[in-house]
Amino acid sequence: MRVRYKPWAEDYLKDHPELVDMDGQHAGKMTEWFDKTQPIHIEIGSGMGQFITTLAAQNPHINYISMEREKSIVYKVLDKVKEMGLTNLKIICNDAIELNEYFKDGEVSRIYLNFSDPWPKNRHAKRRLTYHTFLALYQQILNDEGDLHFKTDNRGLFAYSLESMSQFGMYFTKINLNLHQEDDGSNILTEYEKKFSDKGSRIYRMEAKFHSQK
């Protein structure tokens, strides 16, 4: 997705340090950042924030982190958080490769990856969020019962991710090869998911855990 540059976005985000971490000021203190000590769920690559803000509104007993590196998109997540008055959702504006700088070992209960960039060329495989380098980070920050939820419309990325996770020592608790056909009504659509689905694209989904988190 090409993002149109918003020159004012960075200053806007910096004006809300209570909601947005721009430079790691809360690194290593994620739990303390929230008003209540509750389980932490992360969405990596939140886009415009429809998924994560809907989850946060539905589950006030869970603390959520939206992690998105594009400042020109993050402002839309911030707008939603403010409009909805969410106190259980914070935003990190940084790259996922920095995850273990922000979260302590075992601090996270769930990670969401929704419609991540597939990076289709083989030479870019290490940039995929299900590449083994990222899986190692997820394993480090997830607690013993933690899991990973993954959705995509890209069949190639889905197949790659199944193989990558399996080789890394993960197992799958749920696999949907046509999510919207099998959906029980609990699925929360992202902005892109609705667009892809309206075009007739098949949506793939899985839930996975590590055999040994540590």
Curated annotation (Swiss-Prot):
Catalytic activity: guanosine(46) in tRNA + S-adenosyl-L-methionine = N(7)-methylguanosine(46) in tRNA + S-adenosyl-L-homocysteine
Presence of keyword Methyltransferase: yes
Cross-referenced Gene3D superfamilies: Vaccinia Virus protein VP39 (3.40.50.150)
Positions bound to substrate: 121, 153, 190-193
Active site: 117
Keywords: Methyltransferase, S-adenosyl-L-methionine, Transferase, tRNA processing
Pathway involvement of the protein, from the record: tRNA modification; N(7)-methylguanine-tRNA biosynthesis
The keyword Methyltransferase is assigned to this record: yes
Molecular function GO labels: tRNA (guanine(46)-N7)-methyltransferase activity
UniProt binding sites for S-adenosyl-L-methionine: 43, 68, 95, 117
Pfam families, alphabetized: Methyltransf_4
Record-linked InterPro entries: SAM-dependent_MTases_sf, tRNA_(Gua-N-7)_MeTrfase_Trmb, tRNA_methyltr_TrmB_bact
Enzyme Commission no: 2.1.1.33
One GO cellular component, as annotated: tRNA methyltransferase complex
GO biological process: RNA (guanine-N7)-methylation; tRNA methylation
UniProt-listed PANTHER family: 3-DEOXY-D-MANNO-OCTULOSONIC-ACID TRANSFERASE/TRNA GUANINE-N 7 - -METHYLTRANSFERASE (PTHR23417), PENTACOTRIPEPTIDE-REPEAT REGION OF PRORP DOMAIN-CONTAINING PROTEIN (PTHR23417:SF14)
Family: Belongs to the class I-like SAM-binding methyltransferase superfamily. TrmB family.
Biological function: Catalyzes the formation of N(7)-methylguanine at position 46 (m7G46) in tRNA.
Entry protein name: tRNA (guanine-N(7)-)-methyltransferase
Organism name: Staphylococcus aureus (strain NCTC 8325 / PS 47)
Lineage of source species: Bacteria, Bacillati, Bacillota, Bacilli, Bacillales
